[in-house]
């Protein structure tokens, strides 16, 4: 590596070079616009190179404003000095200006590549070490030397001087003293960015011009010394393009957001010291973008590994579940060896499946005349499937038996046979009946023939054909039986039967009997009410003071006092005996007789009433007065004797005449009187006539 003095020079040289670079940059800034305009119109390749390099410069970090434009004083001085000093540099044309700009862009792209890598590592994107500037400037100087040697535009002595001058100018432009103009330059760049209201194509062109103006600081410092020598050439342009493409691959990784981020960081880090910037930038070799950020696969794998298990998340099959679940062992097979003899039967050549109709049946047991029982008409016969069979006698039952032939061999006989005709049809002859037989193949589920062996079944054959039977003609007995059975079946289904009316309706007869009973009850009620009215009339006709006594004649439990009281009343009142006779008529003796006796007594009472009102009423009254006068003291005595002795008994009859003196003569004679025999003395004898006869 070259010596530090050769690379950077002394401080005096750096100051002079700063002035020259400032003037050069000012002059170049004045002439930048016409040259860039000529490049846009004259050379598309130069414009594309600038656009390409400007994009690289925008993606990478930007150097300080002092490196770009220099001091304000230098800009003013350079603008005044540019007209006189570099007036001859305008004749270079678009090709030389394009080459010079490409050189400046090349240095900018190197800076931008290093800045973009440092921005990914979160270091300061705008601060570069002096060593890095010197290395980049030395490299560019060597390239310039090689180009000058090839073209011969400058002398051997001038090329290192110009290279040193460019290095010194670059070093001077990168010094911390030039950082004071960064706010103004950023403001200018901020004005230039939003001031492009054009399409994308136009914007890219204008960005290229603005990029030339921004990033022309390094190139302008070189141009200030190299304009006199006119060292630019086509080879330099090609090399700068190659270097720009190589640097673009590194700087393209930065985004617009990183550019904004680096611009904001520049303001904060502008006040930092050079020692801090040197310590930060001398960190060693810069890592690549993949080393900084890693790949997407690494991020996903690390996040999956560090992710904790959620409480409800089930464990994977590899997380130890193998030991928890033991392998299921297969169940041991149970084999039982059973020896069953094989039964082979002679089934014949053809095997048919038959569903017997209801007019055919088979007797499985051999026929024996000794145990044969004929079928009865009144019994219902059901087959093994529960269907009702027609009650045909011998004609519809297939029977068989075993017998010996003449030679003594056992032969099986049957009452049925199947005849196969020449056309292939078959007929069943059962006794005198003939049935047509039809064959049909079995489709779907096939029926199998089994032989029962103990509790199991042993298969013998599979049925593939079935037979159906039909009566041959309608004149057969089977057909007649079938039609009759159908008629009976239809008649049984009738729910309502009409019966002839053989007698009277029991309901109407019952209603008539009820009506008769009600009439009889009403007649009896009318009769009783009529009798009651007749009695009431009789009571009202003979009502007097004697009937007003309370139940004197109705109660048997009353003592003899009532009788004596009545006798006392009859003593002072006339007609007492008549009332006693009237009382006898309605006495309880009438209850003991029959209905005819009651009717006779009632008629007698009526006659007595009529007689009392007649002619003999006065005579009877006189006789009664005499008898009552003669028998009054006897009545008192008798009543006294009955009270003292207590042997005078009444027989429960309501008799008011009778034997008062105890001589047995109790006749109360009179015309039209009914004599009642009364035993008053208790001897049980009474000669009075109580037979209901009238004494004339």
From Swiss-Prot:
Keywords annotated in UniProt: Activator, Coiled coil, Nucleus, Transcription, Transcription regulation
Comp. bias regions, Low complexity: 105-116, 158-186
Keyword rRNA-binding among record annotations: no
Coiled-coil parts of chain: 511-537
Keyword Coiled coil part of the UniProt annotation: yes
Span list, region Disordered: 1-336, 526-560, 584-696
Highest taxon above the source species: Eukaryota
Biased composition range(s): Acidic residues: 1-15, 294-303, 316-331, 639-648, 660-672, 680-696
Comp. bias (Basic and acidic residues): 60-69, 127-142, 199-262, 526-539, 649-659
Bias-annotated ranges (Basic residues): 88-104
Polar residues composition bias: residue spans: 36-46, 117-126
Main location: nucleus
Quaternary context: Component of the PAF1 complex, which at least consists of cdc73, paf1, leo1, ctr9 and rtf1. The PAF1 complex interacts with PHF5A. Interacts with ctr9.
Name of the protein: RNA polymerase-associated protein LEO1
UniProt source species: Danio rerio (Zebrafish)
